[in-house]
A protein has these predicted regions:
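Transmembrane beta-barrel domains of bacterial outer-membrane proteins
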Residues: 48-331, 335-373, 380-410
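N-terminal cationic amphipathic segment used for targeting or macromolecule association
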Residues: 16, 21, 45-46, 77
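N-terminal acidic, proline/glycine-rich, low-complexity intrinsically disordered segments
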Residues: 2-5, 45-51
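C-terminal segment of classical bacterial N-terminal signal peptides
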Residues: 37-45
Length: 411
């Protein structure tokens, strides 16, 4: 070993090429050290970036979701801004660990489920009139939220239809739906079956598309100032008007647009058009418009409803099919808090209705209360009486009663 060292020392002193070789080795050593230092710094930087990317975002998600204190009429859905999908994020590549490093410890935290139960809403409706017709609807809907922000709905329940001169009909609906976003457009679709106790099973489906024309503007207090949304609707299934209509196995296709315009924070306009085709060869055109102005806890509204069928088939098919039906009225309403856990609304509609060229009074009286049972549970209970016709009663006066409710449970 000593002889070898002396030999290398001798070469260093006397060889003419030794200076160049040693200089080359010095340069190579500097390059290796520089690359090593740079690689080490980049590894720490990538690790810091990776740690930063894996942290949850501090943004409040309520900035992206608009929730109104009062739902829009007829279950109208407001398009919310696009949901952020964390699954689409691509993290930076992991640096290669040193050969002598220990393997990373696996996380003991359970993986997040692909779907989480978000809420259960149970709708209740009991309709009766002075001609012996009864319709009952009890339909719970389970809502699941997926990891990408989309929603899945499962709807089932029990419906019952009773009418004079007709055997009663029981219905067990089952429907599965999906709601998601494509850009700023909200799409909702559903399909299912209606199972009856003594009638053939029928298929049902519906679809809805919400397109925001003017984006929502919200005040610092959270009140909606302006918004314009246009919707497209498509529905198909059994026409659940009464027991006789179901016994005749009447089905319909209905489609048409909706428009909701929040003109300012106290004024809104809702308008709807429906075109319908029935399997008995009949067709319909239905329109509804409502202009509402809020005055503190009070509100004033004007309603206009038209309904016309190509043919009057009530005697053969069983459903109300007027060739020319018109209803217009004015509404006065009050809504406010009775207690911290109780909020109620009272409304009266006074107007006129026209059927087959004959005019008559058209009045409706409504009340609804919302009870907050807990932070995650609340219930609605409402009652209404109306003499707006739902069937052709000739010279006899018509009177209909509706008891409605909804139980909402959030998880």
């Amino acid at each position: 070993m000593t002889d070898s060292f002396k030999r290398y020392l001798f070469i260093y002193r006397y060889s003419s090429y030794t200076k160049y070789i040693f200089g080359y080795l010095q340069i190579q050593l500097r390059v290796i050290l520089s690359v090593g230092i740079w690689t080490f710094s980049q590894t720490n930087l990538q690790a810091a970036q990776l740690n930063e990317n894996t942290k949850s975002s501090p943004l409040n998600t309520t900035q992206y979701d608009l929730e109104l204190s009062k739902p829009l009429p007829y279950g109208f859905l407001i398009a919310a801004p696009e949901n952020f999908n964390p699954d689409l994020r691509v993290p930076p590549p992991l640096p290669k660990p040193p050969e002598n490093s220990n393997p990373p410890k696996t996380s003991t935290e359970p993986a997040k489920p692909s779907a989480v139960l978000e809420s259960i809403n149970t709708d209740y409706r009991y309709d009766t009139d002075n001609f012996g017709q009864t319709n009952l609807f009890i339909e719970p809907t389970l809502q699941f939220r997926l990891r990408n922000g989309n929603k899945i709905f499962v709807k089932t329940g029990y419906d019952f239809f009773e009418q004079r001169g007709v055997e009663s009909v029981s219905n067990f609906p089952l429907q599965v739906g999906w709601e998601g976003k494509i850009g700023q457009v909200t799409l909702k679709t559903a399909a299912g079956v209606d199972v009856f106790d003594r009638l053939p099973t029928a298929i049902n489906l519906n679809a809805k598309v919400d397109v925001p024309i003017l984006p929502a503007r919200v005040s610092p207090s959270g009140q909606l100032r302006s918004l314009l949304v246009v919707s497209g609707n498509l529905e198909q299934g059994p026409y659940k008007s009464n027991a006789r209509t179901l016994e005749n196995q009447i089905t319909s296709w209905r489609f048409g647009p909706d428009l909701y315009w929040q003109i300012d924070r106290n004024t809104s306009l809702f308008s709807s058009l429906r075109l319908g085709n029935y399997n008995d060869g009949n067709s319909e055109v239905q329109t509804f418009s409502r202009l509402e102005r809020k005055l503190g806890q009070f509100s004033l509204a004007a309603n206009l409803f038209t309904w016309s069928y190509d043919r009057d088939l009530e005697r053969t098919s069983g459903y109300f099919s007027p060739p020319d039906f018109l209803v217009y009225n004015a509404e006065v309403a009050w809504e406010g808090d009775i207690a911290k856990f109780l909020r109620c609304r009272l409304a009266a509609n006074l107007g006129r209705q026209r059927l087959k060229g004959e005019f008559d009074n058209a009045n409706t009286y409504q009340t609804r209360c919302t009870v907050k049972l807990s932070p995650n549970i609340e219930a609605d209970l409402g009652y209404s009486f109306s003499n707006v016709r739902n069937q052709d009663t000739g010279e006899s006066a018509y009177g209909g009663n509706s008891l409605t409710g909804q139980l909402r449970v959030k998880f």
